[in-house]
Structures are given as C-alpha cells and as structure tokens.
C-alpha cells in the first residue's frame, strides 16, 4: 500500500511517498501553488498519484500547541476534501505540530544547509516527517 504525505502551505505543497510496505517515507518534491489564483497543483499531484499507484493520502494538520485548530487547519481540510473528490482516495490527517521546525533543525544541524537551500527543500522534508510519523503510529 502506497501512502502519499502532503504538507499543504499557502504557496507550496510538500510531497512525500511511503515505500510499498509502509515502513519508510521519502520526500518527493515541492509543488508550487497559488491560493489567490486558485492554482492548487492538482494536475501534478495526479501525475504522482498515477506514477506511484497511491492508495491513500495523509495530510498534515497544523494544530496549535494547545491542541486547538491553527489558522491553516481549514485550508488543509479543504485541500483534503478536494483531493478525495478528484482522486477518490481516502484522506487521513496527521498532527504536524513542530514538523517544519524539526525539518529545519535537521537541515541546519545534520546537513549544514544554507538558508536559501533550506527554503527549497523544507516543505518536502516536512511532508516526509508527517508521513513517517503517521507510518510509525499506524503500521
């Protein structure tokens, strides 16, 4: 079963994919989106779904530290609803608190990546962490 992890932002969607057995998550790419112009990257997402034969989506849910809904929760849920509508696949949500912080820390401490390079990969790594957390919890 292949599961695709998504880190939905206002300008980008980080994409990760599980291995076929559901043990590990790997970052795939970052899809550029534009909420103001209603460009959400669904065409590219569809290409990846077909290429990797995806069975399910896991979308990061950006909750606040006190477990209340953050300002992006509704946007993530709306994106998930559209994904279900377009691809007919189930969507589950994974708490993504601190995943972007953890991703940035990994890039700084372990890879010594510059700020400009971090911006280019941070959402992909966050999607990978969201998906890996989901896999660790469920499989």
Swiss-Prot record:
| Cross-referenced NCBIfam families | RNAse_H_YqgF (TIGR00250)
The species is Streptococcus gordonii (strain Challis / ATCC 35105 / BCRC 15272 / CH1 / DL1 / V288)
- Report a single Gene Ontology molecular function: nuclease activity
Q: Which superkingdom?
A: Bacteria
Record EC number: 3.1.-.-
Spell out the SUPFAM superfamilies in the cross-references. Ribonuclease H-like
The compartments listed are: Cytoplasm
Kindly indicate whether the keyword Nuclease belongs to this entry.
yes
Q: What is this protein's function per UniProt?
A: Could be a nuclease involved in processing of the 5'-end of pre-16S rRNA.
Q: What is this protein's name?
A: Putative pre-16S rRNA nuclease
PANTHER family (UniProt xref)? POLYNUCLEOTIDYL TRANSFERASE, RIBONUCLEASE H-LIKE SUPERFAMILY PROTEIN
The family assignment reads: Belongs to the YqgF nuclease family.
Q: Name one Pfam family in it.
A: RuvX
Electron transport found in the keyword field = no
Task: Give the first-level EC class, as a single word.
Answer: hydrolase
GO BP annotation list: rRNA 5'-end processing
Recorded GO cellular component terms are: cytosol
Q: Which UniProt keywords apply?
A: Cytoplasm, Hydrolase, Nuclease, Ribosome biogenesis
